[in-house]
Amino acid sequence: MIVKDQRIIGEGYHEKIGGLHAERNALKNCIEDPKGAEIYVTLEPCCHYGKTPPCTEALIEAGIKKVYVGNLDPNPKVAGGGIKILNDHGIETETGILEEECRQLNDIFFHYIQNDIPYTALKYAMTLDGKIATATGESKWITGEEARRHVHTLRHQYAAIMAGIGTVLADDPMLNARIEHGNDPIRVICDSNLRISEGSNIVKTAREIPTIIATISKDQEKIAKLEQKGCKILKTSEQDGKVNVKEVLKQLRNMEIDSVLVEGGGILNESLIKNDCVHKVYAYIAPKLFGGEKAKTPVEGKGIEKIQEALVFDELKATPLGNDILLEGKVRSCLLES
């Protein structure tokens, strides 16, 4: 946000990887000459050439007189260097502005810079007794319309969306962001034995929406057919007879995918948790009871033996959505990372 004479004259944000950073977008959107203005940024301006030129360069050229910064950039290529360059050019800086609030906004970026897998969040809808489907597998719909609309906003915020083959076979989803001006996330399907149908919505739209299928299958004929339809095949090592989910995430990180929203079933969720790959959870909770020991839960598998082994969450936030509630929280160990 750029301010001059106590008026906001420009705003901007980093819209996508490879696109203009927030500072350059804000300068581009200025309604008048920003010379002598002040700028407020959540993250220290970059000072190196990457996919875009340094933002420090743009601020100097624009004649900005002061920069207010929420967080210093943990990227070793920046890490205080942006502040130094601005100061060396006579631009005043002040850091630590709303530092904690800015850290929360920058969670995904900070994690991406400091870790070898993307920031990974589980999303599921469940009843008050913790069921994501009935004993017969029926799950449409657990939550109401407002909660389901909110999911599409959430998808828009993540670079990729992951699901297991069980979800694809049961629901034939599109896994896109159906909101105005929404960005469709890259779709990642964990399909160990390539059971996905060539007639599924995922495969039929693979040329419109980037689609990755992670597998351990060596079925070259099926692989060739899926590739012809536009799917990218990601081969991984085997873990317990399935794709190695941590390896999948590492490969996604190498593709510069910074965040993954997981909309899988209990088996995929359990695998991710077991491999320490979960950083946040979004639980949409409906005021309903299903019951039944065979009804599916958000996390399958053997479960833990001792309470001390439980995954614990902090920074909890509850949001009413019609008759439902969205409860979100961050895994405690992930808070220590940032």
Spans of features found by a protein language model:
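Zn2+-dependent cytidine deaminase-like catalytic core
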Residues: 2-101, 186, 212, 273
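Short beta-strand scaffold segments in enzyme catalytic cores
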Residues: 1-6, 124-125, 327
